[in-house]
Amino acid sequence: MAMTYHLDVVSAEKQMFSGLVEKIQVTGSEGELGIYPGHAPLLTAIKPGMIRIVKQHGHEEYIYLSGGVLEVQPGNVTVLADTAIRGQDLDEARALEAKRKAEDHIRSSHGDVDYAQASAELAKAIAKLRVIELTKKAM
């Protein structure tokens, strides 16, 4: 039997996941993180993107995170997300529209374009689409 640890994924609205997992993958402020059982204690900001949860017996779940904090303690990992949405709950049409709008905003020739904000919106839309794609494959 594979080693596991307890994971809690919590957003401001509700608890998204609580249970035993074999590992997770998430994007931290310094890059991609793979958290396995026995990982050293860690506290880091997480970037907008997804968390890949590998539950017992290799079953996978994907959750979109708009950002937040990851805390790793012995035997327990907590993700405090600003917003968390399960892959199956994401609306693909809305994500595609958000991506299109962000791309249009970036291409806009207006002088008042905030490229940092437009780029952040584009990254969020792309992350949502990736979560949708991976969730479909996992089903």
Swiss-Prot record:
Annotated InterPro entries: ATP_F1_dsu/esu_C_sf, ATP_synth_F1_dsu/esu, ATP_synth_F1_dsu/esu_N, ATP_synth_F1_esu_C, ATPsynth_dsu/esu_N
Alphabetical list of CDD domains matching this protein: F1-ATPase_delta
Domain of life of the organism encoding this protein: Bacteria
Gene Ontology cellular component list: plasma membrane; proton-transporting ATP synthase complex
Annotated membrane topology: Peripheral membrane protein
Sorted UniProt keywords: ATP synthesis, Cell inner membrane, Cell membrane, CF(1), Hydrogen ion transport, Ion transport, Membrane, Transport
One GO MF term: ATP binding
Claim: Transport is one of the keywords in the record: yes
The keyword Cell inner membrane appears for this protein: yes
Localization (cell): Cell inner membrane
Family from the record: Belongs to the ATPase epsilon chain family.
Subunit-structure text: F-type ATPases have 2 components, CF(1) - the catalytic core - and CF(0) - the membrane proton channel. CF(1) has five subunits: alpha(3), beta(3), gamma(1), delta(1), epsilon(1). CF(0) has three main subunits: a, b and c.
Known role: Produces ATP from ADP in the presence of a proton gradient across the membrane.
Cited HAMAP family: ATP_synth_epsil_bac (MF_00530)
Protein's UniProt name: ATP synthase epsilon chain
